[in-house]
């Protein structure tokens, strides 16, 4: 590798001696390659078209055959062939064939011709080095076989893998589609703080940092919920934020400590309205991104057209296990029944409601393949959700499950400041008992609720998991451009990172 780099450095020096700049300031393409392919699809084989074009891109392949050479040049939209002829280029032919390597960025001006084999080509009249590559490209046929290297050196993955490029194009389309859908319905996006003195809005451990000038301990946000609710208190009736969230938790194929979510709040709505909104939003952006609401994920056909199943947590657990948690009067009774079914009963699950959630996670969650709204959660695990209007001990909450994974979480929001204080104080007691993911008491948020918050529906959707679904990606690392990885060791070799801490 070091010899190859030295050779390319020598070529960069030779370019300077020929009057070329190895790293140009600018170049002005007249077209992108896909535009040329489309606009001149009618050019017959073996014919030329006297139209001046200027294109720029990375040299992907090169073939030199005496007085002729053929390069493949690729820009963001795709490849096109360069036809290089000594008779047309003169001395520049020797320069481009001897000093340009696969991986270099070049600009070319010329006309168009289609080869006898039907390949649209730019017949070069002039060329310019734009950026001399000192490192070779990965093998064009096998790409990056090392999965970890794909994540660690994403730039190489993007160069050689059209599928990877398509994944991130679809991600961008999804994000812009969500924003457009919400904006068209009068939702206003407002940024909330990333650095917070009191993290809240989720059961999660935060990343901790310190503000030196203020000598103030801070955390990165674990949710946007509590600040967006403050905005509703302030009079914004439809508000959302799409952005980064940070949780100091394990890493797996479905978890990354830094991830993207959208949280949406609508005044005068409840969790039923948010179910309708979720269904309409996801089906709409799926149609935009995939061209259909019928998609394939890891060999399974998923139908995201509206009309998703809705079922309570109690119903689903009873259906899967035969256990009716409505009939248990104590934790001991529920635990004994679960253990008889072979289900685990962890000590932190210290109530019937928490055991119900355990039974759901162990016996039901992974079976929910088609989109399913799971509704009416235990109050113990939902400290920010409103108590159910007709079911004591439950709250008006749903989670959306698709392919066995949670994709959304929503409530009829708790707007009673007295009830909210009691819930958060109970969470604080759990923290003191060792539950480091339990929520904290946020006095300013409670003060905002005392000012008065209208009835509100709230929703959070994980963007990364939705991108996984719509791009048929098995791991969250496939849809995050630069996922968190263990650093390389000091000798330059990669520390082994199997992608999981679970």
From Swiss-Prot:
UniProt cofactor note: Binds 3 Mg(2+) ions per subunit.
Molecular function per GO: ATP binding; lysine-tRNA ligase activity; magnesium ion binding; tRNA binding
Pfam families recorded: tRNA-synt_2, tRNA_anti-codon
Record-listed Mg(2+) 2 binding positions: 406
Superkingdom, taxonomy of origin: Bacteria
Cofactor requirements of the protein: Mg(2+)
GO annotation terms (biological process): lysyl-tRNA aminoacylation
Keywords in alphabetical order: Aminoacyl-tRNA synthetase, ATP-binding, Cytoplasm, Ligase, Magnesium, Metal-binding, Nucleotide-binding, Protein biosynthesis
Binding site for Mg(2+) 1: 399, 406
Protein localization: Cytoplasm
Presence of keyword tRNA-binding: no
Keyword Repressor: no
Entry's EC annotation: 6.1.1.6
Predominant cellular place of this UniProt entry's protein: cytoplasm
Annotated Gene Ontology cellular component terms: cytosol
Catalytic reaction(s) noted: tRNA(Lys) + L-lysine + ATP = L-lysyl-tRNA(Lys) + AMP + diphosphate
Disulfide bonding pattern of the chain: none
Quaternary organization: Homodimer.
Annotated family: Belongs to the class-II aminoacyl-tRNA synthetase family.
Protein name according to UniProt: Lysine--tRNA ligase
Lineage, opening ranks: Bacteria, Bacillati, Cyanobacteriota, Cyanophyceae, Synechococcales
């Amino acid at each position: 590798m070091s010899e190859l780099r030295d050779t390319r450095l020598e070529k960069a020096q030779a370019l300077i001696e020929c009057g070329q700049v190895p790293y140009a300031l600018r170049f002005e393409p007249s077209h992108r390659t896909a535009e040329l392919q489309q606009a001149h699809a009618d050019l017959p084989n073996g014919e030329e078209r006297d139209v001046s074009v200027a294109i720029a891109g990375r040299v992907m392949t090169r073939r030199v055959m005496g007085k002729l050479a053929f390069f493949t040049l690729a820009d963001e939209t795709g490849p096109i062939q360069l036809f290089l002829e000594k008779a047309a280029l003169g001395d520049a032919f020797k320069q481009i064939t001897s000093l340009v390597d696969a991986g270099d960025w070049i600009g070319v001006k010329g006309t168009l011709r289609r080869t006898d084999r039907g390949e649209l080509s730019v017949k070069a009249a002039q060329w310019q080095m734009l950026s001399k590559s000192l490192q070779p490209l990965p093998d064009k046929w096998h790409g990056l076989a090392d999965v970890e290297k794909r994540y660690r050196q994403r730039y190489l993955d993007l160069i050689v893998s059209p599928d990877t490029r398509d994944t991130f194009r679809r991600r961008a389309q999804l994000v812009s589609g969500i924003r457009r859908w919400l904006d068209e319905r009068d939702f206003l996006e407002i940024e909330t703080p990333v650095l917070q003195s009191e993290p809240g809005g989720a059961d999660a451990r935060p990343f901790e940092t310190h503000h030196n000038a203020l000598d103030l301990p801070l955390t990165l946000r674990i949710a946007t919920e509590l600040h967006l609710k403050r905005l509703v208190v302030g009079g914004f009736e439809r508000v959302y934020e799409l952005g980064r969230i940070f949780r100091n938790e394990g890493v797996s194929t479905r978890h990354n400590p830094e991830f993207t979510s959208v949280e949406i709040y609508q005044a005068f709505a409840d969790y039923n309205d948010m179910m309708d909104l979720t269904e309409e939003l996801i089906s709409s952006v799926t149609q935009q991104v995939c061209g259909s609401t019928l998609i394939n994920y890891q060999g399974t056909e998923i139908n995201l057209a509206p009309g998703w199943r809705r079922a309570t947590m109690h119903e689903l657990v009873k259906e899967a296990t035969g256990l009716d948690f409505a009939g248990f009067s104590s934790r001991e009774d529920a635990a004994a029944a679960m253990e008889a079914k072979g289900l685990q009963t962890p000590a932190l699950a210290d109530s019937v409601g928490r055991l119900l959630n355990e039974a759901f996670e162990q016996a039901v969650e992974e079976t929910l393949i088609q989109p399913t709204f799971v509704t009416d959660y235990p109050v113990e695990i939902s400290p920010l959700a409103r108590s159910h209007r007709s079911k004591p001990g439950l709250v008006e909450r749903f989670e959306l499950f698709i392919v066995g994974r949670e994709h959304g979480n929503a409530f009829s929001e708790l707007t009673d400041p007295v009830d909210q204080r009691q819930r958060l104080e109970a969470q604080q007691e759990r923290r003191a008992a060792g539950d480091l993911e339990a929520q904290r008491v946020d006095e300013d948020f409670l003060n905002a609720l005392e000012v008065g918050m209208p009835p509100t529906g709230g929703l959070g959707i994980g963007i990364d998991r939705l991108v996984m679904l719509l791009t048929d990606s098995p791991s969250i690392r496939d849809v995050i451009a630069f996922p968190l990885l263990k650093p390389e060791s000091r000798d330059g070799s990669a520390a082994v990172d199997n992608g999981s801490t679970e």
